[in-house]
Amino acid sequence: MSDTVFCRKYQKELDALPFPPLPGAKGQEIQQTVSKQAWDEWQALQTRLINEKHLSLLDPDARAYLMEQMERFLDNRETDQAEGYVPPSQ
């Protein structure tokens, strides 16, 4: 695996993930097409969604919802946001 990938979210070469973040073919696809930066940003959004929407990862519907939101995020489409979340000022 190379140290960089052409990131589908940012449309440029960025640092690669060191290992597939999910099992199976989906994890391999993500490792080959998503940068570490984009994955880290997705994980932060995922954490906010789980916490604010009180999602249980034991619930298949919640897992399907998160997979849908992940695809939307990585494809630069609109995603749900945690209610009341205000990003830190830069």
From Swiss-Prot:
Question: GO molecular-function annotation terms?
Answer: iron ion binding
Q: List the disulfide bonds.
A: none
In terms of domain of life, where is this protein from? Answer: Bacteria
InterPro entries assigned to the protein according to its UniProt record, in alphabetical order: Fe_traffick_prot_YggX, Fe_traffick_prot_YggX_sf
Gene Ontology process terms (BP): cellular response to oxidative stress
Q: Specify whether Amino-acid biosynthesis is a keyword of the entry.
A: no
Q: Tell whether Nucleotide-binding is among the UniProt keywords.
A: no
Name the keywords, alphabetized. Iron
Q: Name one GO cellular component term.
A: cytosol
- Into which family does the record put it? Belongs to the Fe(2+)-trafficking protein family.
PANTHER family tied to this protein: FE(2+)-TRAFFICKING PROTEIN-RELATED
Described purpose of this protein according to its UniProt entry = Could be a mediator in iron transactions between iron acquisition and iron-requiring processes, such as synthesis and/or repair of Fe-S clusters in biosynthetic enzymes.
Record's protein name:
Probable Fe(2+)-trafficking protein
